[in-house]
Structures are given as structure tokens and as C-alpha cells.
Amino acid sequence: MKICLVEPFHTGSHATWAEEYARYSGHEVTLLTLDGRHWKWRMHGGAVALAKRFMAEGLEPDLLLASDMLDLATFLALTRATTANLPTALYCHENQLTYPWSPDDHDPQHKRDAHYAFINYTSALAADAVLFNSHFHLEALISQLPEFL
């Protein structure tokens, strides 16, 4: 099976997971990534840049595996000529609804933090399957989602 793993924030644990998955998978895994910097921009604009590359490179995977840092709904909209019938899975390495904010980040103080969690939510809606790195992580998101919505 050919898998295209899409990761717009390719650094730290995100990079380790993607690279180790590609290395140890029994499948043919192609990494489609952006450098791991400016995470907020990557969540908003990463899908646009990666969709352009996906189309330009003519990738034809059997499965699209997206990181939770990707706005999957936007990515799929921009690549629908190729991905309309492509199975997709969203891998939740973390999520922006329950992930603790840095004390140096001013977005929560200005009530600008909810849209990152909403990107995670709409990405999950757009995916055919949603995978979590742990049962704890799954339960943390599911328990907070009703209040958020």
C-alpha cells in the first residue's frame, strides 16, 4: 500500500513519529512535510502549501495519513481532483483543545485560541478514520468536545 503522510509541523515528536512510521511501516510511505516552525501558521497555511506540492508532485497514494496539525478539510478541498475518492485518516498526535498553552502565548488572553481546536474538529469530520496516539488522548478530547461545541 502506498501511504502519503502529510505533516505541516515536521519537528520534534511530530518528525520522530512521521519518520519512524515511514521507516518501520510495511507500506511504502511518502512524507509530505513542512519545516517545524511557526505552528500557528502551519495550522492555517500549511494545507495550502502542501496541497500545491501534492498536486505538483503527482502523488497517487492508496491512503492519505494526515497529522492533526494539518487543516485536512482545506487540504482535501484544494486537492479534490485527485483525492475525492482517496481514503483519509487523521492521526491525533495531540489536539489543540486540550493541549496546554504556553504562558508566553498571548492568544488565550485575547480569546483567540478556539479556532485551532476547531481546525482539529473539522479535520476529524473530513477524515474517513481518526486515530489517536493513546486511549487517554482520545478520552481527553472526547470529554471536552461537547462543551467546546
Short names for language-model regions:
Residues 1-38, 44-59:
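N-terminal subdomain of nucleotide-sugar transferases
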Residues 2-4, 54-78, 84, 89-91, ...:
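Short N-terminal targeting/anchoring amphipathic segment
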Residues 12-14, 39-40, 72-75, 97-100, ...:
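Short catalytic/ligand-binding loop motif for oxyanion handling, primarily in non-cytosolic enzymes
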Residues 32-34, 91-96, 134-135:
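Short loop/turn segments at strand-loop or loop-helix junctions that form parts
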Residues 39-43, 106-112:
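Short, flexible loop segments at the rims of nucleotide/cofactor-binding pockets, characterized by
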Residues 82-85, 109-110, 147-149:
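A short alpha->loop->secondary-structure connector
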Residues 110-130:
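Membrane-proximal helix-turn-helix segments that form the acceptor-binding/catalytic region
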Residues 124-149:
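A short, active-site helix/loop in glycosyltransferases that binds the activated sugar's phosphate group
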